[in-house]
A protein has these predicted regions:
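Conserved hydrophobic positions within beta-strands
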Residues: 34, 76-78
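Beta-strand-rich interaction surfaces with strong enrichment in secreted/lumenal proteins
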Residues: 45-48, 63
Length: 113
């Protein structure tokens, strides 16, 4: 079964393999692996299986050329989560919420670069 048109990815994505931290609530922080990034969201792999609609923060260092690594921080909502044996964890699709202009510009620069 396919996702409704409103939930389908509409932005270009680029592979991004790095470590990130997700923040749930005010105090819970977990390390995850990233898969890809777009201006609309990103894919991650985690050991936990969050429900669709779960809100979280995410932060990591984004590699940008030229200039090296830049901090990236965003609020996001879980769009989907499914177990992946090949990734040894849950592949989670995140949709960004109210991405700051700085974060949006950095994501666009990364995807375009």
């Amino acid at each position: 079964m396919s996702a409704p048109d409103a939930e389908r990815r509409v932005t270009e994505r680029k592979t991004l393999r790095t470590r990130a931290t997700i923040i749930l609530g005010q105090t819970q922080a977990f390390e995850v692996r990233t898969l890809d990034l777009s201006t609309g969201g990103m894919g991650i792999v985690a050991q936990a299986n969050p429900r669709p609609g779960t809100l979280m923060g995410i932060r990591f260092m984004l590699p940008l050329k030229p200039g090296g690594y830049h901090p990236f921080e965003a609020r996001a909502k879980v769009a989907h989560s499914v177990y992946s044996a090949s990734e040894q964890g849950f592949k989670i699709g995140l949709s960004f919420i109210d991405l700051s202009p700085e974060a949006a510009a950095a994501a666009q620069r990364f995807v375009s670069g």
